[in-house]
From Swiss-Prot:
Its main location: cytoplasm. This is Ribosome maturation factor RimP. It comes from Mycobacterium sp. (strain KMS). Required for maturation of 30S ribosomal subunits. CDD domains: YlxS_C. It is found in: Cytoplasm. The keyword Cytoplasm applies. Coiled coil: none annotated.
Length: 192
């Protein structure tokens, strides 16, 4: 199999090049690049960098990361081999994964602590609850589940391998203080 070309036919950098260029700077800011999407067919072409971190991605951070990414990519445009002048015009977007991204790794669960999620378990059952702490070994997560119509809660420990699907839910009202306490996270940290 032939090696992947360094540059896409559009003259834009490859996903790997963008990741290599930006990884260090984004990591210093506390964020990890989860995905890079290059759309050379769009007019103008689009480079989307999806980042996630332990802290929520706010607008100031997006602006700072975007400026940094733009500077890094502009340097490649000016000096990089094979990057064409046409490639210098592109839309750069730095974004978070979005609320609809399923939680699939231990770090996703850690970052979602305090958030409401809908889970599908390996036995086919479904649960809705609030993500609590991970066990020290990172193999299980606690889930704060509402019991009955009253505001009674229980904490269930679930092995991550027994969770088939987990998606963060959009909330329009803040959780109760008791529910947050059971996640082990103060209200301020949960973004309430």
């Amino acid at each position: 199999m032939a090696p992947e070309p360094k540059l896409r036919p559009t003259g834009l950098p490859s996903q790997e090049q963008v990741k290599e260029l930006l990884d260090g700077e984004f990591a210093r800011a506390g964020y990890e690049i989860e995905n890079v999407v290059i759309d050379g067919g769009a007019r103008p072409p689009r480079i989307t960098v999806v980042v996630d971190g332990d802290r929520p991605l706010d607008l100031d951070t997006v602006a700072s990361l975007s400026r940094s990414a733009s500077e890094q990519l502009d340097r490649v445009d000016e000096s990089g081999p094979g990057v064409t002048a046409d490639a210098a015009t592109y839309v750069l977007e730095v974004t978070s994964p979005g609320v609809d991204r399923p939680l699939t790794t231990e770090k996703h669960y850690r970052r979602a602590r305090g958030r409401k999620v809908e889970l599908t378990l390996s036995d086919g059952s479904q649960l809705t609850g609030r993500i609590g702490a991970l066990t020290a070994d990172g193999e299980s997560v606690s889930l704060v589940v509402r019991e009955g119509a009253r505001a009674n809660f229980s904490v269930r420990e679930l092995p991550l391998e027994g969770i088939v699907k987990a998606v963060v839910q959009v909330e329009f009202s803040p959780p109760s203080q008791r529910e947050l306490e059971l996640t082990g996270q103060p209200r301020e940290e949960a973004g309430a």
